[in-house]
Amino acid sequence: MRPFVWILTASTIPALAVAGPGEDFDHGYRLADAKGCLECHALGYSYIGPSFSAIAQRYRRHPEYRERLPYVIRGGSAGHWGERFVMWPQASLSDAEVRQLVDWVLSQ
């Protein structure tokens, strides 16, 4: 294989590997923004509620929380992150939206 072709091929492989997850991130972020999640949560720092990365760090290693978090989102929560954080119920979200948000948050 010619060196130029090899370099070109090798340099595009990482970009191809990142394309899929980037699209998932954008979709999840847009959904979180559209549904008002960003009014209280941020990606890398606590705002009114805990950051998405802190939520992911706490729960991603526990498979049972992938099933529990939809109930927390839908029903609201208090005390999971101390007395300061109270999340209001988000009952207007569809099952599919809640599942997409849980998957996206846990991927952070």
PLM features: residue spans?
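Bacterial N-terminal signal peptides
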Residues: 6-15
